[in-house]
Amino acid sequence: MSVLAALAKAEAVRAGRAQATAAVRHLHLAERPLVAVPLRLAGEAAAPVAIMIGTSPGDQNVLTVPQPRDRVLRLRFIEQLADVVLPYLSTFLVDTEELTSKAGETYTRCLDAPQMWTPNPGGVNFLKLLGRSVRFHRVDGDNPVPESIPLLGRWLTWFGDRAEHPGSAVLPAMTAALSAHWASGQSTLEDGNLAALLGWIDPPSGFTGAQAAALAEDPLLSPPAGPATDPGFDNEELAPLIAAYNAALDDAARSVAAERLERSLRGQLEPTWQLMWRSIELLSALPEGASVENRWTDDRGAFSRFAADVAEGIPQARRDSAVPAVRRLLERERALEALQGQCAFDDPLRMLEHRVSGAAFRGTVVHSEPERLDRSGSRPKLRPHIHLRTTDPFIAVVGEELTCVERPKQTGLVVEIEGDSMVLELSGGMGRKLVAEPGSVPEEGDDLGFARFKPTPFNGMLNLPAREETPWTHGGPPPEWTPPTDDEGEELQ
C-alpha cells in the first residue's frame, strides 16, 4: 500500500465515508451492460446453483439448478444461460466498420462490444471455469448437447481470458472497479465484500460508512455477493430444499420443490443485484478518462477477432503452447505499463502517487525562451528553453528526457539544474517550422507537470527467436537423435 493510499484510508475513517482516489473513471461503461450475479455449490468449482442476469435493473432472469450435482440439470441450466447471453452478444456483431491495416490488409471491427459485470473477481473466475467445463462438449455422436452449450463455453472462456488483460473492460469485477476509484476505511480483504464497500462509498442516510459496513457483515441482511454462499444458508435452507427436490415422487412435486428453491435463491440474489446497479450509477457519475476510449477500442478489436474465429470454425486451444504463452505474457506486461501511465496522465490524483515517489513533478515556469534555435547541427532546429521551479521531491538528472503531462507529445530534456529549478529543452508538439505554433510553448507563470514515463510506451513488434532457434521444450524442433556408441551404451547399462 502506498503512502497516499494509506492516507486516503485514514481520512475515510476520520470522515466516516470513502474518499475518492480518482478524479475520472478509468474504465469504459457500456450503455447496455449485462450484469450477472452467479452462485455455485459449496465444495464444487464449477457447479452452478443459480444466476441472476439481465441488462436493466427491472429486467432480470433468474436461472436455477434444483440439483447442482445432476449433470443433466446442469447442462440444461447452461443451455438456458446461453439463451440469454448469446443473443446479447449477437447484437454487437451487426454494426461493423471496414479498416485497413498498415500492411494493406482489410479487416472488420465491430462498432461496439459487450460488457458483462460480476460482483467480484470470484464471479469472473467462476464464469471462466463454467465456460471451460463445457466448451469442448460434442454436438454429435454419443450424448450430444445443443450447439449453444459449447458455443457459450467458448465465449465465457474468452471473456475470462480477456478479463486478465490489464485495462480490459469486457468482464470487470465491481469490487475491483469501486476500489480503483474510492478508498474505504477498511482493509483490502474487507473491500471484497460488495455490500460493505458500497456502504463506505454510499452509506444510507443517517449512517456512517463504518456503521453501514458493519450491517453489511450480517448475511441475513446482506447475503454474500457470490459465487460462494453463506454456510448458514447452505445448511438451513439450501440443503433441505435440494433434499426436498430429490425426494419428490412425481413431476408436480418436483415443480413445487423447484419453485420453493427458486424463491429462496432469488432472496439471496436480489440484494446483490440492486447493489450492482447502484454501483454502476456511481461509476457513471464520474467523467470518463481521456484514454479509456482507446482501451475500449482494443477490446472491440479483440471481440471482433474472436467472433471471426468462431464464425470460421477455428478451434479454441485447450491451453497456450510455449510461444503463444510468452506473447500473451509480454502483451500483458506492456498493457499494464501503458495502463498505469495512461491513468496517471488522465488523472491528477493518480499522478500524485508518482509525484510522491519522485517519478514526476509539477512546477511553475519562471522563464521561457520560445524562439530559441539549436544550431549545433547542419540545420537549425526549434528547441525552446523553459525554466521551471518546483517544490516536489523530484531529483532531476542532467540529460534525462521527461514527458509533459499537459502536452504528452512534447518532451523536455534536462540541460541544467539550479537548486529548486531546472532548465528544460523542449522538442515535439510545436509544429514543423522554426517558429512554434501558438500555445505550443509554455509561457511564464504556467503550471506544468513532467514525468519520467510516457502515457503510451513503445509498442513495437515482439521479437522472438525463430522456431529453429527455439529450444524444443518451448516449441522448437526436437533435437536430432543420434544412436549411442558402444561405450556410451555400456555406461547407460
What label would you give each PLM region?
Residues 50-51, 383-386, 422-423:
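Short aromatic-glycine-enriched beta-strand elements
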